[in-house]
Amino acid sequence: MKNRWKILAFGVFFVAISGICFAQVGPATMKAGTYTWVAGGMGGGWYTVAGGFARLVNQKEPRINIKVIPGGGVSNPIQLSQGEADIAWGVGYVDKAAYNGLGPIYDKPYKNIASIAGTLAVDYYHFLAAKDQGITTLDQFVAKVKRGEKIRIAAPMTGTSEYVMTSFVLQYYGISYDKIKQNGGTVIQAIYGDMPSLFEDRHVDYAFTCVGLPAAIVTEMSIARSAILLELSDEIINYCAKTYGTVELSSGLCKVPGGTYAGMPNDIQTLCHSTEILVSPKMPDDVVYVITKILCENKDFLVQLGAGYKVFDPKKAGLTVQVPLHPGALKYYKEVGYIK
């Protein structure tokens, strides 16, 4: 009887040990460590997804512990570069600006950053206009400004990445938010939560935002007042992709599908930027390899955390980053044949 219990106990012990071994994705020589992931605001999408993915990584590789802390798209590359974090969410074009020291976002380059995957999710620039303004394209909006018409617009807040990008777009056309003001128009910089009431109550006739699809605030505005998203030309989308690192037109992602919002039955071409995951170049190659592997082999899990991650394509993830790939990530992509 005692021998039977010994055999049973040994069997349980063996299964337990086997389970631990199977749980390890990384090589036996990989050292255990705790890493800090700077995400977005607490309770927001970035923060929530980072927390969920951190738990998945730890389940599959117990030697990797990830602590998630609040952050933001503009500040994350700085914190990463200065050694205050090991992993960070990033906005593709913002990361490129940080790496190159592009003003007005950054006053110097932050080179101590790397990436493991690009285009995890996409946010869309919504150039919304009231239908009574009689236009359907951004080119027509620009023409109004150049004619000196008094435009009333709700714009993103200074300091946000979307304020910078919409400013770059206007600059491409030779106009600016200041030009709108000089014409006697109104530029109200507002948080997104305030834009619907400004639009509905006719304090503004236009609203510029950058959000995922479908955007609740745009839905609210388009229901409260007949509206249209202004279509952007191939030229401006290609220019921003080449110059700043926004999503390329050839990706097929630069459109808001018809039916997303009330009164807009057709696809509307627009500018969009992508999300990527950054890491410190100092992170061990084997740790980054494991994180990249878990990320690329668990897309369904990401989509459960957020529907916006449906656009994530592991086969292209290593090719759409805006800063250099970490060697550990590159090793994974080469191993599976995604990068030759």
Where are these regions (language model features)?
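Short, low-complexity disordered leader/linker segments with a strong preference
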Residues: 1-33
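Bilobed "Venus flytrap"/periplasmic-binding protein-like clamshell domains
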Residues: 32-60, 64-67, 125, 129-201, ...
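Pocket-flanking alpha-helical
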Residues: 49-56, 67-108, 193-198, 213-222
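Pocket-lining segment of extracytoplasmic ligand-binding domains
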Residues: 92-94, 103, 115, 133, ...
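Signal peptide-directed extracytoplasmic domains
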Residues: 93, 98-123, 128-138
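Short, solvent-exposed loop/turn segments at the edges of secondary structure
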Residues: 120-124, 148, 271-272
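Bilobed periplasmic-binding protein/Venus flytrap-like ligand-binding cleft at the lobe interface
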Residues: 141-146, 246-302
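An extracytoplasmic/periplasmic, membrane-proximal ligand-sensing/linker region
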Residues: 206, 211-223, 229, 272, ...
